[in-house]
Amino acid sequence: MTAVLAYTSPAMGHLYPMMPLLLELRARGLDVHVRSLDTLVDQARAAGLSAERIDARLRPIADKHPDWAATNAKAALERSATMFAERAVLDGPDFRRAIEEVDPDLLIVDTNAWGALVVAEAQRRPWLHFSPYLVPLRSTGTPPFGPGLPRWDNPVGRVRDAVVGRLVFGAVERSIIPRINALRTPAGLAPVRSFDDLVLAAPLVAICSAT
């Protein structure tokens, strides 16, 4: 039987949006395994999935970097990015252990599990990058992620987006990309230059939205 291994970051809102996909795979006869929060393991098992908890050390890291306490968008993004980078040191090895236990044919990895994404990219199985929210990829005419700016599709708006993008999300990237590449290099992966590179490294990306 074809086996699937799904790995989420330590947040309820990251397993729930993934469940319709996992249940559909199970309905089609696949053996679906999940690694998620310990508080969600019983629910996943009740739904007919094989489930185990992720490394218990991952969840407390969020308490060290509360993005809600930030005073501006840039600071909030920096806190979140720092949290993901710290967790990556743990979720990468945790995911690798899960792969060794399950020996899956297909991997599904949460967008916020940066270490697990590196592990997935470095191995040879097919894999999916899963995001429970719209991914902040750059695109022409779209305001930069973070400040909540309205779309302003004219020359002045494009200048605004370029400047604000460098000051906010661009600044966060410059501080965090070296930490991501520090995980990638030992895995034999080429360095990334942006968050876009990290997301688009996957052979397939699934994005949930409210529309």
Q: Locations of the language-model features?
A:
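Short, acidic/turn-prone active-site loops that include or flank metal/cofactor-
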Residues: 10-12, 55-60, 131-136
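Conserved nucleotide-sugar phosphate-binding/catalytic loop shared by glycosyltransferases and other
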Residues: 34-79, 158
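Conserved nucleotide-sugar donor-interacting segment of glycosyltransferase catalytic cores
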Residues: 85-158, 211
